Amino acid sequence: MLLLATALAAVVVLHFFGLPASLPLWGLGLLILVIFRDPERDIPSQPLAVVSPADGRVTSISTTRDPYLDRDSIRVTLKMNPYGVFTTRSPVEGKVLQPPSSHEDARMPHGVWLQTDEGDDIVLVMMRGRLHTAPHCYIRIGDRIGQGKRCGFIHLGGQIEVYLPERSRLAVTVGDRVDSGSDIIATLQHA
């Protein structure tokens, strides 16, 4: 809608004032296209795989306490590329059991608890973007979401944390570049 309004304004300005006056609006339209682009991704057909929720780089991997589920876990932190795609995707297929609920920490309201059909718990945390704009989360309690499906948007990128079960096998290392929905960051392990 925003793109359509910008294009219409550019055409009107072009008609009445000429090309030089309309160039800023055409530039704005191009910027909107770049910021809101959302390419299709090839989602791997591996049921126990955990795919990257965002385009970016792995900045840290640590064993830590999951503040949402109060359990020991592996935390994979991703820094989104400021010029990349800003759509976030579900790392696993499963059911949303807990919406953003904690108000103790400014980062915590954007945590989502996903439980797979096998009973594995994954927490996806979307943190504020570079302009401190709140992430948009499109999923709610009780929703079922597919692996690699769109679940949110962070304006101009930000940081994402994925809390995995402690027994997960990692497929990435610090410094790796990953694409949302298509690159595997871990595999869930069952005894």
Per-region residue spans from a language model:
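Contiguous, well-folded functional domains in the mature portion of proteins
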Residues: 1-191
